[in-house]
Amino acid sequence: MGVDELSHLKFSLLLESSACNDLSGFKSLVEEEGLESIDGSGLWYGRRLGSKKMGFEERTPLMIAALFGSKEVVDYIISTGLVDVNRSCGSDGATALHCAVSGLSANSLEIVTLLLKGSANPDSCDAYGNKPGDVIFPCLSPVFSARMKVLERLLKGNDDLNEVNGQEESEPEVEVEVEVSPPRGSERKEYPVDPTLPDIKNGVYGTDEFRMYAFKIKPCSRAYSHDWTECPFVHPGENARRRDPRKYHYSCVPCPEFRKGSCSRGDTCEYAHGIFECWLHPAQYRTRLCKDETNCSRRVCFFAHKPEELRPLYPSTGSGVPSPRSSFSSCNSSTAFDMGPISPLPIGATTTPPLSPNGVSSPIGGGKTWMNWPNITPPALQLPGSRLKSALNAREIDFSEEMQSLTSPTTWNNTPMSSPFSGKGMNRLAGGAMSPVNSLSDMFGTEDNTSGLQIRRSVINPQLHSNSLSSSPVGANSLFSMDSSAVLASRAAEFAKQRSQSFIERNNGLNHHPAISSMTTTCLNDWGSLDGKLDWSVQGDELQKLRKSTSFRLRAGGMESRLPNEGTGLEEPDVSWVEPLVKEPQETRLAPVWMEQSYMETEQTVA
């Protein structure tokens, strides 16, 4: 931004502070720019004196403050003594006194009095030869006729407001009947035609910028009664009042509490209060076509009448965005459009606001278009996967190597205590090498194999089995998770009857095959104890305390002693110890049955 544009922007802020009677902001700007800027002039968009036409006119801060009735700012400017009260500027050659009279604000009498006391000339003429008293518009309401007479007397030379008010009180009062509009919706109060009221459908009052940021937001400066529906400005107590979307962060969504009657949050509410705040919001105004198009007869229409009047939309949110063809409108403040398309989302001051394609040219450079705004991508949905699917995947691990490793008793004794699988098996588990389950039979088959593997390991090494259960990836989320004791009890009852008798029969048949006997002798050398040394002795106390393990040793020892002497005709070892084992309760025979089963599988593998 160049130096000229920056100075123009700051002076526009000075004029805006004068119009709003913001004395503190006005003082800070004057001190920042220097006191000499207080008598400067800048362009101001508004109605020309004595005419309904709108346009840019050169105005000073004193003239703008007098026009809008900013009493405190006028008093401060005059008190500095750095301004010329009778200075005229603009194409109409108006002075501050002309602006004060034509503004018809509520403080017009006090403003005129301050100017007259500050040596303002009531006989000064503008470019059309009109004195300040000549630009007073005829008051169409008799309510303010007395005030108009006071203003005329002040301009005729009597600058004492108290004296004029005393003369006015001495005059007989005129009884005036005030017509009150009935509460019926179809009927309303009739007002005479007011030529001073602007046309809210044409000119600057019909532009998108004015509709979104000034319509029913800026206060009306007229002190007489007039038709509020024909006036684009807001009046005290008017239901059509809007909050400025640049100052109050609210959306175009209607407030549910306001619909019921009143909203407890007031101006701080994040939702729109009323139809004007909803449909004149920058995010929604003229983003749709009017059904009547160019034949629309509404005084204030919220929709576009032509396709070229449509304001662009955000593809992701559907709300209005800045139009690349529109720019700044100087009928508002220079900082008026530093917000984005939706009020609660503030954007940098360099971003162009949502303006219309037919907006007025701006002395300030345009900003970024909506194409440069960052695209808002909706977040991807993080939905939890199927528990059944995750349970099946955890069971689809290939246990072929682990099952093969169980064929050797030495591998069982050397298995690491910290992991239920070998290192290669754990790598496959972490890598996620899965195969899809084709049927429920595969699923349940995998479950049986996995459970059987854990049961066998629990028999050989209880500590290893407990570690594997605590680190199992399936234990938490599997649909088939059950109590381990219930699984052991149910399966032990089923296999005990089938395996115990077949174990005895296979053992008897094994003794009649010398080739198998020699191979079995080599493979079962480590079955006696953990250190590999066979213990053939059986003590009485050991038989009572370790009945199952001792009997298993005796069983192994019997085979070791029988197999080498098969050809000598020695008698077979006594296996009557199995009979009481089969008749024992389920809890007592559980471990020996599984030990026998493992032993039989070892024999089958060797064979």
Curated annotation (Swiss-Prot):
Residues 161-193, 342-363 are annotated as: Disordered. The keyword rRNA-binding does not apply. It comes from the Eukaryota. ANK repeats lie at residues 57-87, 92-124. Disulfide bonds: none annotated. Residues 349-361 have a biased composition (Polar residues). GO terms for cellular component: cytoplasmic stress granule; P-body. Residues 161-178 have a biased composition (Acidic residues). The keyword ATP-binding does not apply. Keywords: ANK repeat, DNA-binding, Metal-binding, Repeat, Zinc, Zinc-finger. PANTHER family: UNKEMPT FAMILY MEMBER, ZINC FINGER CCCH DOMAIN-CONTAINING PROTEIN 66. This is Zinc finger CCCH domain-containing protein 66.
